């Protein structure tokens, strides 16, 4: 099983990153994709991936929250980092019109620029979309023919949005959000509609600790070692064997991010 979304650069892991990776391995997690969300954290993610060769890889990009930082120098840094062997996708990039920490115009500019970098380098994109689906799809679609793959990280949308993502060929990342009985029920009902070869799994650690995890960790911090729990729950709600689902989603991740 492969965790495609871990924020291992987070300060929440500052005291015990090595142990977090060890616990993930002990839990049966076969690989981790470390998320880059701005130039500085993308560089940190790259260094962490290099510290765990053949187990950790990373993305390089600028999250929509940080899109106001986007300029030529940042673009050059992302382009340069993308040439590292351990950097396997451009992102986390996209649109987030929920909080608008950067203006919609700044977000669209940074998103389009990162899609152009990914197309130039023929790299997959690691995508973020929140409360921006129509504009997200309209900006992304013209680039899809030039991209080897596009992954919607932490998908939490509705059936119409899922169908639209699948229709243009996107791969869907599912987190422990689906384990939340308060806000994950709609997403849970959509799980059987995601083709197995288009499904990826992720913790988004240290965020989104599964609410149905027992016993709950005292820290309330999510970790990649909890990925098996998420996979078991997804498999149950899809009517599939958990071991098989862990294997197929692992194969999907390795194919999409070209880790073979």
Swiss-Prot record:
Cofactor(s) the protein needs: Mg(2+)
Positions with a binding annotation for a divalent metal cation: 92, 128, 153
Protein name in the entry: 3'-5' ssDNA/RNA exonuclease TatD
Function text: 3'-5' exonuclease that prefers single-stranded DNA and RNA. May play a role in the H(2)O(2)-induced DNA damage repair.
CDD domains hit by this protein: TatD_DNAse
Gene that this sequence comes from: tatD
Gene3D superfamilies: Metal-dependent hydrolases
Subunit structure: Monomer.
GO-annotated molecular function: 3'-5'-RNA exonuclease activity; magnesium ion binding; single-stranded DNA 3'-5' DNA exonuclease activity
Enzyme Commission number(s) of this protein: 3.1.11.-, 3.1.13.-
Keyword Hydrolase: yes
